[in-house]
Swiss-Prot record:
Family: Belongs to the glutathione peroxidase family.
Assigned keywords, A-Z: Cytoplasm, Oxidoreductase, Peroxidase
Reaction(s) this enzyme catalyzes, per UniProt: a hydroperoxy polyunsaturated fatty acid + 2 glutathione = a hydroxy polyunsaturated fatty acid + glutathione disulfide + H2O
GO molecular function, one term: phospholipid-hydroperoxide glutathione peroxidase activity
CDD domains assigned to the protein according to its UniProt record, in alphabetical order: GSH_Peroxidase
InterPro entries reported in the protein's UniProt record: Glutathione_peroxidase (IPR000889), GPX_AS (IPR029759), GPX_CS (IPR029760), Thioredoxin-like_sf (IPR036249), Thioredoxin_domain (IPR013766)
Recorded name of the encoding gene: GPXHA-2
Active site: 54
Entry's localization field: Cytoplasm
Protein name stated in the entry: Probable phospholipid hydroperoxide glutathione peroxidase
SUPFAM superfamilies given in the database record: Thioredoxin-like (SSF52833)
GO biological process, one term: response to oxidative stress
Length: 180
């Protein structure tokens, strides 16, 4: 069986509802537009569940922006997925989330519509990410700012805890980008 990636996810994995005909993940961006994740094929991705009122917000957002600015022209992309499952720390509407991320933290990377990352209603992408790289205490996402690093082929390379600073994984990003 071929290794599954975030770009081509079969219907039978995790008994998910049928995926689109091309078996690609699709999510809505913060403006409600459908985005096929296959558009990021060939890029190194850092996929992060974010929140605006978390204790990790003020450290993670600026570091994510720094990484994005530094490597966006070398094939690096950050995909931010707001989530309100941890302490209700992302209560805003999608519009409020966009204003917060893009104005306060100058986020130029894609911000998606709010998703669930755990439970029966978890976003299919997050079900796949968690099954690909379980955490220290099982597959569940434990808090905001859990990060998944995905290579250019869509394979999940690593998972980082919320306490892991984005800048501390720069070496892993550089390795996947083949940057000295």
């Amino acid at each position: 069986m071929a290794t599954q990636t975030v770009f081509d996810f079969p219907d039978d994995v995790l008994q998910q509802p049928p995926m689109p005909a091309d078996n690609a993940f699709s999510d809505k961006d913060v403006k409600g537009q459908d985005v096929e994740l296959s558009k990021y094929k060939g890029k190194v991705l850092l996929i992060v569940n974010v929140a605006s009122q978390c204790g990790f917000t003020n450290s993670n957002y600026p570091e994510l922006t720094t990484l994005y600015q530094k490597y966006k022209d070398q094939g690096f992309e950050i995909l931010a997925f707001p989530c309100n499952q941890f302490g209700g720390q992302e209560p805003g509407s999608n519009e409020e989330i966009q204003v917060f991320a893009c104005t306060r933290f100058k986020a130029e990377y894609p911000v998606f519509s709010k998703v669930n990352v755990n439970g029966k209603e978890a976003d299919p992408l997050y079900k796949f990410l968690k099954s690909s790289k379980g955490g220290f205490l099982g597959d569940s996402i434990k808090w905001n700012f859990t990060k998944f690093l995905v290579d250019r082929e869509g394979k999940v390379v690593d998972r980082y805890a919320p306490t892991t600073s984005p800048l501390s994984i720069e070496k892993d990003i550089k390795k996947l980008l083949n940057v000295a």
